[in-house]
UniProtKB/Swiss-Prot annotation:
Self-association and partners: Homodimer; disulfide-linked or monomer (edited version) or heterodimer of an alpha chain (AC P0CI44 or AC P0CI45) and this beta chain (non-edited version).
Source organism of this protein record: Lychas mucronatus (Chinese swimming scorpion)
Protein name: Lipolysis-activating peptide 1-beta chain
Top-rank taxon, per record: Eukaryota
Organism ancestry: Eukaryota, Metazoa, Ecdysozoa, Arthropoda, Chelicerata
Function as written in the Swiss-Prot or TrEMBL entry: The homodimer inhibits HMG-CoA reductase (HMGCR) (32% of inhibition produced by 0.6 uM), a glycoprotein involved in the control of cholesterol biosynthesis. The inhibitory effects of bumarsin are seen at much lower concentrations (0.6 uM) than that for statins such as atorvastatin (5 mM) and simvastatin (10 uM). In addition to inhibition of HMG-CoA reductase, this protein lowers cholesterol levels by inducing steroid hormone synthesis via StAR, and by increasing reverse cholesterol transport mediated by the induction of ABCA1 and APOA1.
LCN-type CS-alpha/beta domain span: 20-87
Keyword line: Disulfide bond, G-protein coupled receptor impairing toxin, Ion channel impairing toxin, Neurotoxin, Potassium channel impairing toxin, Secreted, Signal, Toxin, Voltage-gated potassium channel impairing toxin, Voltage-gated sodium channel impairing toxin
Location of this chain's protein in the cell: Secreted
Length: 94
């Protein structure tokens, strides 16, 4: 029974520690389109947003957009991701 409780708590902690899948947004609040790009392009974009990886997703009919795997909601926004990487950019730290 104790093992089951430890496993359950571990799963809950891991799920809250990891992010989810989000479409990253540029500094203009637009999504990164990938109509003529590859999964490698989206992977690079997503890693800049501190995601585990990324791919080109076509969930919106004809439009294709980069989707990031395991990224926090905050880091899906361009300036939030920059502030996470460089604390000197954080407005509240000044």
């Amino acid at each position: 029974m104790k093992i089951l409780a430890v496993v359950l708590i571990s799963v809950i902690v891991l799920n809250t520690a990891n992010g989810e899948n989000y479409y990253p947004q540029k500094y203009t609040n637009d999504y990164y389109g990938c109509q003529q790009q590859t999964d490698a392009f989206c992977d690079k974009v997503c890693k800049l947003h501190l995601a585990e990886s990324g791919f080109c997703d076509q969930s919106w009919g004809l439009a294709k957009a980069c989707k990031c795997v395991n990224v926090s909601y905050d880091n899906s926004f361009y300036f939030n991701a920059l502030e996470s990487q460089c604390p000197l950019l954080n407005k509240s730290a000044a």
